[in-house]
């Protein structure tokens, strides 16, 4: 690959919100799993995943990943102040060692 084609990874700060706008459904499973793992590592006990309202494809993938993840204590669609049905709030089981 020539120097002009090299893509450098970008370090993105992890907060309590993951915005999936612009990502393809095929990318979402891995993104959600990595995000939840990072939240656990950083001690972020709860957060929100913005999947958009659309036809629900990303929402279904996000909810499926949250259901499968043993570190997830609970999750629900956002309320009126946190994105409504275009976002999902979650709580993690924090390891208090």
Name every feature range the model reports, one short phrase each.
Residues 1-97:
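Long, charged, low-complexity intrinsically disordered regions
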């Amino acid at each position: 690959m020539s120097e002009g084609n090299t893509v450098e990874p970008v370090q993105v700060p992890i907060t309590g919100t993951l915005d999936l706008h612009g990502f393809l459904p095929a990318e979402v499973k891995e993104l959600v799993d990595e995000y939840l793992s990072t939240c656990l590592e950083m001690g972020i006990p709860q957060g929100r995943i913005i999947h958009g309202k659309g036809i629900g494809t990303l929402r279904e993938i996000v909810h499926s990943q949250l259901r499968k993840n043993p570190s997830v204590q609970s999750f629900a669609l956002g309320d009126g102040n946190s994105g409504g049905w275009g976002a999902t709030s979650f709580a993690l089981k924090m390891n208090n060692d």
